[in-house]
């Protein structure tokens, strides 16, 4: 890998593992990062592998990712596989000195996630969790406006409402991600963790949480409906009101653009995010005004895969820390676990510093 501050024109050599539904967004994003060349990928399903080759022109496919590591000697690996596989793959990459970007959920449990992060730290490799929601352009713009004092010097509340509509009926989740049906934990583990991380990004440290979780669709194993309450160190309150069963007030493909509607209130006004990505600012006593900022429908959800992978690339090139490093993401996962504990005990749970 080119050293920090290097003027070398050599591209970073990357490899990917996985060829499922979501991996296509990540393969496409890598093709738009000029400092990166994906030299090979690994997948054991020949049909899915053929799809990746046909769509992205990647002709080197390995059934064994360890052989790929040893043969290609990449600078980094992008792990786009189900959570139970992450620990073994990360360990093999770390012991070879390969930098890692790994999809979330990071592992099947917080304990396993801690071991994954510790392995990478001992090996001295950079480790980033591919947590892309905070990189969605509307959340970056909302963060900028909060920091600029657009809604005052005190944050009052954050309230996000999500209705995804892909989880009702006997065939729920089968078209895209059928394994969701068998997750014993679903809504918070798979989707809510995005918003836990985003709320931390926007409002800072979380000190206490309360959660109510339930299952609306009897054909799945995990929860698909929840109300999550956050208390922040700065005095603000947060709420995530979500279910994957009911539908939003827009065509279903549109629901996966912003994943819902957002209201952020402060001492001098409020910000609103709409389903189409529009942001408005309303000062106290004033009219609602549209905020002009760039966002588009390329890639996934505002092109957040590209933006997250661009961030990882920049961190590799400059040796700067990743926003969603392993150590930082463990804090998000601890809050996730606290949400499940709260739902189980039917009471608030304090977040230890």
Q: Would you name each region that the model predicts?
A:
Residues 102, 127-129, 159, 240, ...:
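Hydrophobic residues in well-ordered beta-strands that form the structural core
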Residues 2, 196-278, 306-320:
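Contiguous beta-strand/loop segments that form the cofactor/metal-binding neighborhood of enzyme cores
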Residues 1-11, 76-81, 283-286, 312-353:
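C-terminal helix-rich "cap/oligomerization" subdomain common to oxidoreductases
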Residues 1-56:
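N-terminal Rossmann-like dinucleotide-binding module
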Residues 126, 133-220, 229, 346:
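Predominantly a Rossmann-like dinucleotide-binding segment in NAD(P)-dependent oxidoreductases
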Residues 45, 56-119:
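Beta-loop-alpha module in the N-terminal Rossmann-like domain of NAD(P)-dependent dehydrogenases
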Residues 297-309:
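Active-site loop of classical SDR/Rossmann-like NAD(P)-dependent oxidoreductases
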């Amino acid at each position: 890998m080119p050293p920090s501050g290097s003027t070398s024109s050599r591209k970073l050599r990357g490899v990917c593992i996985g060829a499922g539904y979501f991996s296509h967004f990540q393969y496409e994003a890598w093709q738009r990062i000029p400092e990166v060349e994906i030299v090979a990928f690994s997948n054991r399903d020949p049909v899915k592998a053929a799809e990746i080759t046909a769509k992205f022109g990647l002709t080197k496919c390995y059934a064994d990712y360890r052989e790929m590591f040893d043969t290609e000697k990449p600078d980094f690996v992008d792990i786009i596989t189900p959570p139970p596989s992450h620990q073994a793959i990360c360990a093999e990459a770390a012991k070879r000195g390969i930098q890692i970007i790994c999809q979330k959920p990071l592992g099947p449990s917080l304990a396993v996630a801690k071991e994954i992060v510790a392995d990478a730290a001992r090996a001295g490799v950079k480790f980033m969790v591919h947590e892309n929601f905070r990189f969605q352009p509307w959340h970056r713009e909302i963060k900028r406006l909060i920091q600029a004092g657009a809604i005052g010097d005190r944050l009052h509340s954050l309230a996000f409402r999500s209705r995804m509509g892909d989880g009702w009926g006997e065939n729920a989740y089968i078209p895209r991600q059928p394994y969701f049906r068998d997750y014993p934990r679903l809504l918070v583990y798979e989707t809510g963790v995005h918003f836990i991380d985003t709320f931390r990004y926007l409002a800072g440290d979380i000190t206490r949480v309360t959660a109510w979780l339930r299952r609306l669709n009897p054909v799945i194993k995990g929860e698909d409906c929840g109300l999550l309450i956050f208390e922040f160190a700065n005095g603000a309150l947060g709420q995530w009101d979500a279910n994957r069963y009911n539908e939003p007030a827009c065509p279903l493909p549109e629901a996966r653009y912003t994943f819902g509607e957002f209201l952020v209130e402060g001492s001098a006004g409020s910000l609103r995010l709409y389903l189409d990505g529009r942001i408005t600012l309303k000062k106290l006593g004033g009219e609602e005004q549209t905020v002009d900022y760039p966002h588009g429908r390329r890639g996934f959800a505002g092109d957040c895969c590209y933006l997250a992978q661009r961030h990882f690339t920049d961190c590799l090139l400059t040796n700067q820390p990743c926003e969603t490093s392993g150590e930082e993401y463990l804090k998000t996962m601890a809050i996730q676990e606290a949400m499940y504990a709260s739902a189980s005990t039917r009471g608030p749970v304090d977040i230890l510093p």
